[in-house]
From Swiss-Prot:
The gene is thiC. Substrate binds at N197, M226, Y255, H291, S311, R312, G313, D352, G353, L354, R355, E391, Y418. Keywords: 4Fe-4S, Iron, Iron-sulfur, Lyase, Metal-binding, S-adenosyl-L-methionine, Thiamine biosynthesis, Zinc. Pathway: Cofactor biosynthesis; thiamine diphosphate biosynthesis. This is Phosphomethylpyrimidine synthase. It comes from Bacillus velezensis (strain DSM 23117 / BGSC 10A6 / LMG 26770 / FZB42) (Bacillus amyloliquefaciens subsp. plantarum). Binds 1 [4Fe-4S] cluster per subunit. The cluster is coordinated with 3 cysteines and an exchangeable S-adenosyl-L-methionine.
Length: 590
């Protein structure tokens, strides 16, 4: 696949991992083709010849970028996978949409903003009186193509997917204006998902870097992306990302609304915010983080905290509430927001604006007061058949994590939980991907549906491409560990295949089956780079004489040769050594 460019800057377009290929599982119609990554395995060589090992198929988030038969020009965007499904239901209409304004990109009228050169199609919206959400269809008993697609991906039945969505326990983020996305589901009875945050800031980064980070993150396994841009060209950056993104995209609309009022929180208005919601809805944002639970009466509860309000969105709304001494317009206009959401099928990610920013503040009154309000808002959204997930902390020590999950399930009626970690200690700047992955694995096991990744740069700076990779892989580990603990169907297949390859010294298969094949091979080759080392029955950790797996295999071979069980072989070996010791005179030192 050829590398493309954004405004003459290089963007890395991926190829598949070594030892893997893109395959598709077909559904009930030819246009339901579910992508998977198939990992080829070599044969096992044993005493009785070779035994074939079946390939392993794994969940694939990389989109068409890793399909050698698809040519991608990121200036044009990805193919519109879902358009036929969306229009075929007969409940959407095209319309002209709003005009893009200079202030959408953070410029004054005389300035010139960057533009996306690709396909300019008219936005879609629900026809008058119609509701186009996946929750609405599920409650009507309709299994949509999106639901069937997901069922194949998750190895469950389409009816199970429909039931989970209808109950509110799962969501399918799927804006009708993001037809490029491959359907996925967020719910605790499915694979634990991970989100990767990208986005420019007023200080650093560019459109090119953010598009590259997006393609990079999905290559390593990000299930959704959040564009948290706060600098110039916000609208255009988002357009580049959405048109080229095969996974759902989320945003925090208050960030862009704040840019439109020059960063002065008290100048925000409902009209500016509403216009921003529609702007982003027309572009195709799949879920909005909205901090509607930050109420005026909750702000004083944060006064005695160690770290106060650490959520950007929460701090913006708290400042607005105090400046006007009024309740947040996100709260007072919530039903109107629901009307917008269901017009495009955008899911709520109800923001935890009062999440704890230190373990000293974990599980405090402010945090749980906001959670109560999020529970109330969830039921209002469900009244409109709008999909909802709930955002969670934050910084929480291990012994307080389960309380968060239990309260969220009870208060928010089992709506999916989406947590940032949580970070389990505050003493490891530079390693917060690890401090948070510990909490993420635990809360994923307890029932969290999606984990927001944390990179090594957390609290320190804007992550670069390498940081994104590190964060995604770390969180894939946490999510997979949670899947194993929950007993998700098929979760252990990959572990078992890798363990078998490890015991049989099939080094390349070990690399190919790992979450980061390139890193695994790199570390192996640092000490044993020769090609022959890829078939050696040892590694540099123990060497040839002390490899426990090689010794175990020797015992098995001895047992087979002598018609013994492995226990009998060990006992026979002990007897032989005892006899040898006696024959040499039974002397302790020879």
């Amino acid at each position: 696949m050829q590398n493309q460019s954004v405004q003459q800057a290089n963007i890395s377009i991926m190829s598949s991992f070594s030892g893997s290929k893109k395959v598709y599982a077909e559904g009930s119609s030819p246009d339901i083709r579910v992508p998977m990554r198939e990992i080829s395995l070599s044969a096992t060589t044993g005493a009785f010849g070779e035994e074939e090992n079946a390939p392993v198929r794994v969940y694939d988030t990389s989109g068409p970028y890793t399909d050698p038969d698809v040519q991608i020009d990121i200036h044009e965007g990805l193919g519109a996978l879902r358009t036929k499904w969306i229009t075929g239901r007969g409940d959407v209409e095209e319309y002209n949409g709003r005009i893009v304004k200079p202030e959408d990109n953070g410029y004054k009228k005389e300035d010139h903003a960057a533009e996306y050169p690709g396909l300019q199609r008219k936005p879609l919206r629900a026809k008058p009186g119609k509701n186009v959400t996946q929750l609405h269809y599920a409650r009507k008993g309709i299994i949509t193509p999106e639901m069937e697609f997901i069922a194949i991906r998750e190895h469950v039945s389409p009816e199970f997917v429909r039931e989970e969505v209808a109950s509110g326990r799962a969501i399918i983020p799927s804006n009708v204006n993001h037809p490029e996305s491959e359907p996925m589901i967020i719910g605790r009875n499915f694979h634990v998902k991970i989100n990767a945050n990208i986005g420019n800031s007023a200080v650093t980064s560019s459109i090119e870097e953010e598009v590259e980070k997006m393609t990079w993150a999905i290559r390593w396994g990000a299930d959704t992306m959040m564009d948290l841009s706060t600098g110039k060209d916000i609208h255009t950056t988002r357009e580049w990302i959405i048109r080229n993104c095969p996974v759902p995209v989320g945003t925090v609309p208050i960030y862009q609304a704040l840019e439109k009022v020059n960063g002065i929180a008290e100048d925000l208005t409902w009209d500016i915010y509403r216009d921003t919601l529609i702007e982003q809805a027309e572009q195709g944002v799949d879920y909005f983080t909205i901090h509607a639970g930050v109420l005026l009466r909750y702000v004083p509860l944060t006064a005695k905290r160690t770290t106060g309000i650490v959520s950007r969105g929460g701090a913006i709304m708290a400042q607005w509430c105090l400046a006007h001494h009024q309740e947040s317009f996100l709260y007072t206009h919530f039903e109107e927001i629901c009307e917008i959401m269901k017009t495009y099928d955008i899911a709520f990610s109800l923001g935890d604006g009062l999440r704890p920013g230190s373990i000293a503040d974990a599980n405090d009154e402010a945090q749980f007061a906001e959670l109560e309000t999020l529970g109330e808002l969830t039921e209002i959204a469900w009244k409109h058949d709008v999909q909802v997930m709930i955002e969670g902390p934050g910084h929480v020590p291990m012994h307080k994590i389960k309380e968060n999950m239990d309260k969220q399930l009870e208060i928010c009626k089992e709506a999916p939980f989406y947590t940032l970690g949580p970070l389990t200690t505050d003493i490891a700047p530079g390693y917060d991907h690890i401090t948070s992955a510990i909490g993420a694995a635990m809360i994923g096991w307890y029932g969290t549906a999606m984990l927001c990744y944390v990179t090594p740069k957390e609290h320190l700076g804007l992550p670069n491409r390498d940081d994104v990779r590190e964060g995604v892989i770390t969180y894939k580990i946490a999510a997979h560990a949670a899947d194993l603990a929950k007993g998700h169907p098929g979760a252990q297949i990959r572990d078992d295949a890798l363990s078998k390859a490890r015991f049989e010294f099939r080094w390349r298969d070990q690399f190919h089956l790992s979450l980061d094949p390139e890193r695994a091979m790199e570390y192996h080759d640092e000490t044993l780079p020769a090609e022959g080392a890829k078939t050696a029955h040892f590694c540099s950790m123990c060497g040839p004489k002390f490899c426990s797996m090689r010794i175990s295999q020797d015992i098995r071979d001895y047992a087979k040769e002598n018609g013994l069980t492995e226990d009998e072989a060990v006992n026979e070996g002990l007897k032989e050594k005892a006899k040898e010791f006696a024959e040499k005179g039974s002397r302790l030192y020879q």
